[in-house]
Amino acid sequence: MNAQTLPMPALKHVCDLAVTISAPVEVGVTPMGLRRMIPITGGVISGPLIQGRVVSGGADHQLIVADGTTAHLDARYVVETHDGVRLYVHNTALRFASKEDSLRIMQGQPVDPNAVYFRCQPHLE
């Protein structure tokens, strides 16, 4: 079998999202870990290819496992572009940080982004 090197994918900046949220709803500890739900109350989309707003009514569902350093995130919300098109967004993500930084994140305090491993896979409809 011949190995083939794939080319590096080309990435293009589409937009930035500034999402507003309200206080987390603590579900509590379950057999899977600590569950939280963070309501998404709105936001702004700005960028070279898409502008618009984040529609109120979405949420970021979080499962914080083990010793609190690992979080599985599942956010679902709707965005409306400047020309009235609505898109359904479903983000799945993995976040890992030290115990100290994880606690700061859960309390809504700022954390150095370089101290956090964060990978997100957005799905758009």
Indicate residue ranges for each PLM-predicted region:
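Beta-strand-enriched cores of mature, soluble protein domains
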Residues: 1-125
